[in-house]
Amino acid sequence: MAGRVIIIGAGLAGLTAAVAARTEGAEVLIVDRGPIGLGTNSALANGVMSGPSDRYGAEDYIRDTLRAGCGLNCAARVRLTAREAPSAFRVLRSVGIPMRERGAQRTVVSPDPSVIPGVTLMRRLSDHVRGLDGVHALPGFCVTELLRRDGRACGIRGFTRRGEPLQIEAPAVILAAGGAGALWRRHDNQRRIMGQGYALAAQAGLELLDMEFVQFYPLVLAEPGLPALIVYPPFAREARLTGASGEDILAKHGLADVNDAIVKKRDRFSALLFEEAQAGGVFLDLRGVPAAAWDAHPLAIFRRLRFPFRERPAAVAPAAHFMMGGVRAAETGETDLAGLFACGEILWGLQGANRLGGNALTECVVSGALAGRFAAERALAMPPAPSCGQKAQPAARAEGAGTAVQYREILRGLREAA
């Protein structure tokens, strides 16, 4: 098990961690309950990443992040992200991710505007990871517990998609399992995102911070029969938000720039639209949008849906979107449990009470790169240790653990690399 890093979660944070860990020379195994890459929330993202640039300084980014988070952010984490973001963005470009920089944001560009940018991002990154020797993936694997020995993480236990119990040992484990949005009846997350990483962390004795801060996205389709798809910015100038009686909601509340409200005031904008929805409904009216706009992102995505958007308004409402709270970790990504690292949405500190638009993916690439690098250093520096076996201290006892399938047998049978 020496030199091995296990990554729980195959979204942007997990795959970024895999690239970093492999670059340092570690053997990497990625496990996920769903498909690698495209089965994660990262694939549903608009592909926007906030961060410092030549025209948007680090202090500007820090100010906007703290302001959006109502000052409840971990200031050290915000400064760390500002410092590390530019290099993390360069890594994405180096592996073939098409990105456009404009002011405070980098945006992933899909060659086909009807394809969600997150899909393009995760396809390209998954393809890159798939080509790395020493990186393996186990999709359809459900982790049920973290193994511990002598006060440090030493592996995982769980079940394969065929229901086989499996114990895998490693001197470094990275939690990159995402948030818990699918716990809400109305959400825009993948259905599997139900807080498994938080549960594993809590069972291992880690403190979860600020879990009361849940971000709702303001504009999500609410038409019966349609998926709960985000209405991605930029918001078309000719589009209108109306109430049940046809009144202009934006004018009613003095919102001159809806895109600014989506990015910087998402919490208050969602609360406002929720109240309007309770009073009779909120509708997105795209009938005045020019035909040419339907050939460009983001409206080109709507062409795939069976709804007459050009003929009548569509119901929209806020939906659970992102968890601001999570696990505390050092700058290296290591948690209070030695050998256990965390990255992505499960990590506490950057967002405060409300996330700045574009900071989700930024958090993934920055914290993923750091966790992967330092987890690899930890794994490579550790001498061979006795098996976790019966001496391990699992956070929760799993039935059938004694009949665990050997890791090497499973690895030889893998047909899908991340």
What are these regions, as identified by a protein language model?
Residues 1-3, 20, 24, 35-37, ...:
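Glycine- and aromatic-enriched mobile tails/lids
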Residues 4-30:
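N-terminal Rossmann-like FAD-binding beta1-loop-alpha1 element of flavoenzymes
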Residues 11-12, 35, 180-181:
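Residue-level detector of alpha-helix initiation sites
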Residues 34-66, 70, 231:
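Conserved N-terminal glycine-rich FAD pyrophosphate-binding loop of Rossmann-like flavoproteins
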Residues 38, 88-165, 169-172, 176-177, ...:
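Conserved redox-cofactor binding core of oxidoreductases
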Residues 138-139, 144-153, 159, 297-349:
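A glycine-rich dinucleotide-binding beta-alpha-beta segment and adjacent secondary-structure elements
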Residues 172-225, 361-374:
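Glycine-rich loop(s) and the adjacent beta-strand/alpha-helix scaffold that form part
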Residues 200, 206-308, 312, 374, ...:
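An anion/pyrophosphate-binding glycine-rich loop and adjacent beta-alpha core
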